[in-house]
Amino acid sequence: MEIIRGAPALSTFRVQKLMEACVNAALPVRQIYAEYVHLADLSELLETNEREQLEKILTYGPAIEAHTPQGLLLFVTPRPGTISPWSSKATDIAHNCGLGKVKRLERGVAYYVESDTLTVEQQQTLKGLLHDRMVEVVLDDFAKADVLFKRTEPAPFKSVNVLAEGRRALEVANVEMGLALAEDEIDYLVENFVRLNRNPNDIELMMFAQANSEHCRHKIFNADWTIDGEAQPKSLFKMIKNTFETTPDHVLSAYKDNAAVMEGSVAGRFFPDPNGVYSYHTEPMHVLMKVETHNHPTAISPYPGAATGSGGEIRDEGATGRGSKPKAGLTGFSVSNLKIPGFVQPWEGSYGKPDRIVSALEIMTEGPLGGAAFNNEFGRPALLGYFRTYEQEVSSHNGVEVRGYHKPIMLAGGLGNIREEHVQKGEITVGAKLIVLGGPAMNIGLGGGAASSMASGQSSEDLDFASVQRENPEMERRCQEVIDRCWQLGDKNPIQFIHDVGAGGLSNAFPELVNDGGRGGIFNLRNVPSDEPGMSPLEIWCNESQERYVLSVAAEDLPLFTAICERERAPFAVVGEATQEQHLTLADSHFDNNPIDLPLEVLLGKAPKMSRNVVSAKAVSPALEQSNIDVKEAVKRILSLPTVADKTFLITIGDRTVTGLVNRDQMVGPWQVPVADCAVTAASFDTYAGEAMSMGERTPLALLDFGASARMAVAESIMNIAGADIGSFKRIKLSANWMSAAGHPGEDAGLYEAVKAVGEELCPELSLTIPVGKDSMSMKTAWQQDGANKTVTAPMSLVISAFGVVQDIRNTVTPELRSDKGETSLLLVDLGAGKNRLGGSCLAQVYGELGDIAPDLDDAALLRGFFETMQKLVAKKSVIAYHDRSDGGLFTTLVEMAFAGNTGLAIDLSALQGTDVERLFNEELGGVLQVSRADAELIAAQFAQAGVPCHMIGSLANDQRVTIKDGAREVFSETRVALRTLWSETTYRMQALRDNPACALEEFKLKQDKTDLGLTVNLSFDPSEDVAAPYILKGAAPKMAILREQGVNSHVEMAAAFDRAGFESRDVHMSDILSGRISLEEFQGLVACGGFSYGDVLGAGEGWAKSILFNERARDEFSRFFERDSSFALGVCNGCQMLSNLKEIIPGSEHWPRFVRNRSERFEARFSLVEVQQSPSLFFQGMAGSRMPIAVSHGEGHAEFASAQALALAEASGTIALRFVNGNGEIATQYPQNPNGSPNGLTGICTTDGRVTLMMPHPERVFRTVANSWHPDNWGEDSPWMRMFRNARVNLG
């Protein structure tokens, strides 16, 4: 084992935060220094030149410190027996650079702690601050790290002696293995193995437990129900299916695959043919949808829990039909009170929590980062979400008790597209190869399906930890590229049948695959790729290692499939063959035995059906006491409630522009305020048709009325999607995620009531279908504290996600109030019809109460009338702005619209009934519309004609104040800036805790700056002019290499931009160049695309660059290309970072910087303002002086120069091509207008001859006007960024 020092691991402010944590823990620590240390497992000693090459590969990030560190060494490494994603990708780079003697690279962080002598207890406390016990260990000596590379002998399976010891043997195994088997399931297994006359093996029991867990089998939703002594006619699932039976319209696949599919639009699908040439293929682009939860793992270890939750849902989408394409994501979190240090709110009590789960604050600090990081690296935009905090002692259905989300909801979902011929699974032919695609088996995530089916507190802590998985999104991206290549082949697609590997690992996935295909299978255990040879058969078969799919491929198609995988560098293995007989055999060649030998029907067939005999309960809760509520104080509290407050800290960490197909994300208007009601995507680059998603959830209402909570969730999702141009209810399909504390008094009957309200009544009445969903039935946390039994039980929680097909994405209405549209009026549509019920509201919550009566959708006709009227208005462009009324009531709706439009309001409540508090803060269904004053009465009359109450409530005000009156009486008045400050303080506090606090403060101050102009546009050219048109007509299109490495994810939109400019865009993978299949000699131009090559493990873009510099063939190819006078190149984002590391082979690039970690130390996804500079760059000719917004999505975009002199030389060279600026056109020095902290706002630079240009922002994602989060009304189809690509075509003549 070689040990190689690396760069400092922590920035100054990270060290400072660590020191503060030490002080808070009363540790006598004076100083901490941390640096990366690399470990190389070698097959033989390296030669001197090889050692030097390895050291160069492992040189990245900040400069390595020259000093010898002092103090107590605490060396944090990945847990022995696991292989970190960093390791697998860094090892790939070493191999691609020709270092075959490197068996494996691994990395740890060496902490050197200078302190007074620490007691054993203090050392344990310190270790707790330095490592994540879920995935890491702390060593006191570098030499001890060789345990990471230790190989152990495989362990055999174990049998459970049922034949001799009977049922008792299985009862003991059930507890010891954490199988969560029910009594009747134990009977079933004993009976079947006695019949088979053999003992079950541990692997078979674990496989059965996973396949039949509540998590996988949804026993409660399929159960027979008796409520209050009366047998119920339908199961929960049958009531959900009733929505499909009533309205099957436009549904192509429901209840039988990894996701549901509905009919989409016809558009030109853009992808490369088998020769790599991109083009449009006009065809139906059907829409798939799925929403998952990952609650249990997120409670234990939020980052990997949320990351793998997102990853699993993305795999569900990709594994739909015979392979499909995930497109856009949504997310959601429900947690208990945050109790932010220094910002604890009056309603946040201190009830405690068990040690084995983390706090709500930790979940919301780490969980969203995990989910966002996975989506970012995979390359799926995260466009929609919800966030609720709830934890309160209330009088509900079970009397007075604490209700809340100690067991959180972590929701991950999204939509994708699928080809018509691939919607249905194919036939698994007898003899077909059964394949696992993706990463290796690792000893992690054991028993996740069974563990998540228990209430938190029933399983032991070790089992809890074992049931959390780890994430490697770059591997999943590679697998998705394989799936993409397969579906792009149309009827020649080699995939017959595909499933993702999720709960239960291969033990659930392979049996499900063959069973669903009507086949059996013979498998060889030792063919499963595994990085841990000491694993037992159970661990190999049942672990939940992520980023894996199982699929069947006909034997004759195996060479084609193999070639695709090798090109994409996606690992795969043939593990078995499909058989005619529905029997499952798993052979182990190492021990020469069969750990599994079972008829499939024993595993998946006739397991006992559950019966639920339950009693209903009625909630009795006093009315909300209004007499002590002051409107001004209520405003302060409600705007500080995380459910209502600014959610920037959850949004800017997630890429929202990747694919180039995003039309509407969470951010709205020139000031990019996160208040959007729905997300909208374009179907493709050649159409205005698209897709929309929204969410709805009103979970606290269930503490008063289960049915109302469910109806309001459905209704809210419709109110949120109503601003998109969809047309008909029948074009909207819903996903329903049901969370409940099954077995808790009153909850089971309440769940039945809620499902019935939606499945049997509301949805059929509105022609809405629920073709997909998920349930999580163990939403209760129990523990002991100071000798007392404590519980926190979640409300019954229904989260609805609505998916619609959009007719014209240009018609989408957002909450941005417009002060440039002449005289306008604000209308309130009130579906609550003046009832003003306050039960379960945010107002009640912030005063520590629940209230007595929940708001409800009393008549479905009200929602139908509203939606149909709204859709006519949207299609005619009669609505200027729209925002629904929900959490925080009318007051919140109005001020959020004011924030988005940067305007004041003059509101008059006199048309509304009730007290001030009721009128402002009730959360009945409704919405506010801004319309032209000339149209206001006519529009109000249209709503009235549809049976929907509609009131004039005011207009915009020029004084930047929000003033609310009741006739002449002033009810409330405050400046917009003061309200925005209140609303944004929660996100500021969270950002300051999690990110660079200096950046967080700068952003908070910018939100309070009345003079901030937001995004502005000033162009020096006409964007509607196509300067390339004369050249395109000349004949053959010049060839453009659309270059990607493993992990790159922005290549398709880049190909589309160059295609529109008249180039032949060709897909070129680095493996094509390294293998010699393709030469750069063929191309006039090259573009290195954005993404996460090798997951950015050796510095962003650096691993990619080193695989070129240290590979003879690649270095030669690229050197020759850059030396050619006629060639040109563009590097964007990851491609920019990569090319900046190729300075030694790019003429005229000596002055270039390298790109390092953003100043905020956070991935930044922003829509930022830049100005084009005067430079020789061929891409920016004729554009100098133009100021316009552009998509920014990166974690390492800070331009770092070797010295101040080097920066001065770069400035003097005249090659700076782009700078971040503010709305006045001044160089942006403050965050977030300068999102990465680069000196002088630098974000684009070129060679001295202008042939090679680097830029961190993404012009390819915004070359269409509709892909810009905000733009002036007068822009046409092409945004100004299209000029760049056309300039490249003009340059070639």
From Swiss-Prot:
The Glutamine amidotransferase type-1 domain, residue ranges: 1040-1293
Location(s) in or outside the cell: Cytoplasm
EC number: 6.3.5.3
GO cellular component, one term: cytoplasm
Main location: cytoplasm
Lineage top rank: taxon: Bacteria
Residues binding ATP, per UniProt: G305, A306, A307, T308, G309, S310, G311, G312, E313, I314, R315, D316, A676, S886
GO MF annotation: an example: phosphoribosylformylglycinamidine synthase activity
Residues involved in Mg(2+) binding: D677, E716, N720, D884
Residue ranges of the region described as Disordered: 305-328
Cited Gene3D superfamilies: 3.40.50.880, Phosphoribosylformylglycinamidine synthase, linker domain, PurM-like C-terminal domain, PurM-like, N-terminal domain
Catalytic reaction list: N(2)-formyl-N(1)-(5-phospho-beta-D-ribosyl)glycinamide + L-glutamine + ATP + H2O = 2-formamido-N(1)-(5-O-phospho-beta-D-ribosyl)acetamidine + L-glutamate + ADP + phosphate + H(+)
Biological processes, Gene Ontology terms: 'de novo' IMP biosynthetic process
Pathway(s): Purine metabolism; IMP biosynthesis via de novo pathway; 5-amino-1-(5-phospho-D-ribosyl)imidazole from N(2)-formyl-N(1)-(5-phospho-D-ribosyl)glycinamide: step 1/2
Cross-referenced InterPro entries: Class_I_gatase-like, FGAR-AT_N, FGAR-AT_PurM_N-like, PurL_large, PurL_linker, PurM-like_C_dom, PurM-like_C_sf, PurM-like_N_sf
Entry keyword set: ATP-binding, Cytoplasm, Glutamine amidotransferase, Ligase, Magnesium, Metal-binding, Nucleotide-binding, Purine biosynthesis
Pfam families to which the protein is assigned, alphabetical: AIRS_C, FGAR-AT_linker, FGAR-AT_N, FGAR-AT_PurM_N-like, GATase_5
Family in the record: In the N-terminal section; belongs to the FGAMS family.
Function comment: Phosphoribosylformylglycinamidine synthase involved in the purines biosynthetic pathway. Catalyzes the ATP-dependent conversion of formylglycinamide ribonucleotide (FGAR) and glutamine to yield formylglycinamidine ribonucleotide (FGAM) and glutamate.
Record text on subunit structure and interactions: Monomer.
NCBIfam families with a match to the protein in the record: FGAM_synt (TIGR01735), PRK05297.1 (NF003672)
Name the UniProt record assigns to this protein: Phosphoribosylformylglycinamidine synthase
